[in-house]
């Protein structure tokens, strides 16, 4: 029964592999339960969508530049023709700096992970080896029941 699951197997699998691929029922609700179980086990959770990530490594761990939409306004003779660049701090590295000392680490829960390329998924597999306090959960699709598998096993199959 879904209501009686404790999530211990999920947490153990995440701690062992560092990056998991998840298939969840499309009606939703299961992700929140497992995120809550991660938080009760001492992890902080950050949910983000794979759409619009751009360069995953720069977005998560490096300072990167973004250009806001121009909204029809132009700066004639000032700056680049394509608009100004604003530099944004890395999302995951910034969250790691603000973790409490008793926290086990940060879990990046990435929604709509099926749009990520194989190279981006390989980077997400290597991220927990680069920074041991980061764990990664990528939602890769729908299933009739909530199931997970190490992300590197899923990449090897694809």
Swiss-Prot record:
Q: Which residues form a coiled coil?
A: none
Location, primary (coarse class)? membrane
Q: Where is the signal peptide?
A: none
Gene Ontology molecular function terms on file:
oxidoreductase activity, acting on NAD(P)H, quinone or similar compound as acceptor; quinone binding
Q: Known InterPro entries for this protein?
A: NAD(P)H-quinone_OxRdtase_su_N
Q: What EC number(s) is this enzyme filed under?
A: 7.1.1.-
Q: What keyword terms does UniProt attach to this protein?
A: Membrane, NAD, NADP, Plastoquinone, Quinone, Thylakoid, Translocase, Transport
Reaction equations catalysed: a plastoquinone + NADH + (n+1) H(+)(in) = a plastoquinol + NAD(+) + n H(+)(out); a plastoquinone + NADPH + (n+1) H(+)(in) = a plastoquinol + NADP(+) + n H(+)(out)
Q: Which GO terms describe its cellular component?
A: plasma membrane-derived thylakoid membrane
Q: How does it sit in the membrane?
A: Peripheral membrane protein
Q: Does the keyword Cell membrane apply?
A: no
Q: Report which superkingdom the organism of origin falls in.
A: Bacteria
Cellular location(s): Cellular thylakoid membrane
Similarity field: Belongs to the complex I NdhN subunit family.
Tell me how this protein assembles: NDH-1 can be composed of about 15 different subunits; different subcomplexes with different compositions have been identified which probably have different functions.
Q: What does this protein do?
A: NDH-1 shuttles electrons from an unknown electron donor, via FMN and iron-sulfur (Fe-S) centers, to quinones in the respiratory and/or the photosynthetic chain. The immediate electron acceptor for the enzyme in this species is believed to be plastoquinone. Couples the redox reaction to proton translocation, and thus conserves the redox energy in a proton gradient. Cyanobacterial NDH-1 also plays a role in inorganic carbon-concentration.
What is this protein identified as?
NAD(P)H-quinone oxidoreductase subunit N
The organism encoding this protein is Crocosphaera subtropica (strain ATCC 51142 / BH68)
